[in-house]
């Protein structure tokens, strides 16, 4: 019996390449095919600041680009990252985010004579003083979508915004067009670029057959063939079929009576099954069958044979069709598995998902999902990169755009600039909504299809690690330690530095202020030196981590009243007491009032004070002075009674509150609460540093520094190894060396322009971004080499990978080697300019203000955008991943209060007063006097979405009543620690602050899903596999 590794289903051909799992035939010259070598640069640089990310794998032996879920030695399972690439192509930006909303449309010409269009949507951004701009640039090369922020005081013209979105455009003339017809033209033009329905051919082959004519003449079904068809889809009756028909006759049965149909992730697929199409004995070439399958871009060839049967390898060079570009050849490997090889015509770009080792699949739904996803990506890759398709599609799009320009340029109403932005008028907004109602195909219904079972196929999962109402924004963070279940982070806000310890299993957390320091821009934990490096507007300084941990332990474990007091994190949503009175927390399920506590080794983490409806109690107050302590306050219920808090190390703190009533625990913002209530102080966790202050050590000569990086010669941190610190100070690059507990300046190098970004490559070697270009600098020899230059773009970030460097200009990412030569044929086209980059095996993440993009390193395509909406529910603070379009663009992230209850993970929403009179709750942002009556949820900011959990079906039905300012206040701004976010064990931590709510998110690859077992007769090759993800 043949083994899986030496069976060839396809004969090698000069014009075709073959993917078979561990070998990429005819592709030995690919840059991704070079074996891994010891890392040249990044293992000791600050860009991998935890010094355990040396395995920045790009590829292993061709297409084996497994994620962090790779297989280790002795394991018999592989995980599959199954994702449709570039899903935003099916999320019509103009249809969903512009049409029916206030926006401007422009048409213009470039210096070279080409025409272009632009659509701009301006919104209030979550960060005060900034506007958010969504832009669509319609060029002859295609559609470019960008999302970015600009300062309100910045003087921006339409040309400035368009240049920001697409810097390479050299605009000669532009004008705003006020025409309802242009709304429809742009909507229709975008839809021509969207493909959500697919037709794939299915050919039956026998063991002794090798030609297409033999395949097309097969008629009889067999159990193996029927089993394969049933796995792929459902047999449907064509007569009166209402789904996507793929060119088949659904009225007169001229193309057969039945066919095979399926839908997956919102995409409809009709298979052209050769044995279900009409067969003519008199026609040896079966022209009627070829009329359908011959026009399909993707074909599946299934060999109906036993695993032991020898087959003649199929020769793809015998294909006669000009349309057939990708073939999936499948045969039974044994009773429970299939063997698959993918045949691709040369000239087509690479696409995923990547085949597993030996390409053996079990006969289950995972195989169906993988195969159809692979074929969907294959057809898209062929249309975009195969010359025969791409040239024709580009020419068609060019003709359509030029026709639109000619149509509206000749209109007398469009010959001049529109002075008052009439394209934002009510009439145009209503016209857009009417167009959406008339054509709902790409609206809510499609989104709902896309979201079906989406959580099962997410490559990356996002979870909220921490959320809190703070009056200070989280600026940056770094990781002390992290694993699957625990994490310790250092978090810097606008006012202070905190230490956050979390247990993901128990939900226990401790968020402790340790240093009061304003305006921290960036911080880095330098583990070999055991220091915390901090950048502020006054320059660089550092703290000894041992002192920080000692301070943290003193503050968090002392069983007596320490010099810091922390408000306990609530564990139960606040509810009303049906018997009257006001309780901190109430419960209908408990018979006696008690204190709910969460403990950890470092002390109490959260405490919820629970009062029972039947026993109205009050909590004895803690008496202390007015200075940063509780002022003789308590919570009283109408029926009296007392419950003592017997909980050591639980302390409450406020800022000099003025309590007008003995029934108030907290009083702030001059609020008056007649029957007792909870008023949050302006800072929900207040910590006063103890007498033993933490000493700060300044790094002389760094005032005005904007960027920095470091390298360490040895990961183990040997004392004799010198740590080098690189500092960008305006037009000067400074070098500091660690010497006896201090950073001492040893060299400086003047440059011709201000340093915008820098990336440590190796000891003494730095990649520096200045205006329009990146430089490679050897600071010891003072050698400056031009690495890569783009005259129309600004450098943003650089990231050192194994054997190559990722350079980001505005919204373009380019891979180069140390000589500046491109190492990859593709570019990363970010949807929003990244402020940070994170690298995990097989993927790179771009973190920007509005969203996080996950792109595959196989071809640069986007496979996921995250996180989706952050919302509050009565159970938890959740990431709403339900609707697929929210994963593509975080268009409306609203803080949501469901059923008048706050999440137990969101503590003390800013300026929230809760007064319970006669069992009624009031939620008010401005602190109203509440004497009872009705349930109120008052919010004076009504400019944005009020509910992030949008019912998209209702959205389509209610288009005429939409708020034109939808989304104005509900977009979250994401920031991350340092220049990247890659941390221990593949965990990525990102901070988000918006409207007083601060969150820390953990992103990790989904290791629970799509695990592909390998049969015992197919031993894996450990040498070709990435290391397993630690648990």
From Swiss-Prot:
Keyword Disulfide bond: no
SUPFAM superfamilies linked: Rap/Ran-GAP
Alphabetical keyword list: GTPase activation
Start and end residues of each CNH domain: 471-881
MF terms in GO: GTPase activator activity
Keyword Hydrolase belongs to the record: no
PROSITE patterns (UniProt xref): CNH, RAPGAP
Pfam families: CNH (PF00780), Rap_GAP (PF02145)
GO BP annotations listed: regulation of small GTPase mediated signal transduction
Cellular component, GO, one term: cytoplasm
Region (Disordered): 18-48, 920-950
Bias-annotated ranges (Polar residues): 26-41
Sequence ranges assigned to domain Rap-GAP in this UniProt record: 186-404
InterPro entries: CNH_dom, Rap/Ran-GAP_sf, Rap/Ran_GAP_dom, Rap1_Ran_GAP
Entries under PANTHER family matching the protein: GTPASE-ACTIVATING PROTEIN DDB_G0291510, RAP GTPASE-ACTIVATING PROTEIN
Name of this protein: GTPase-activating protein DDB_G0291510
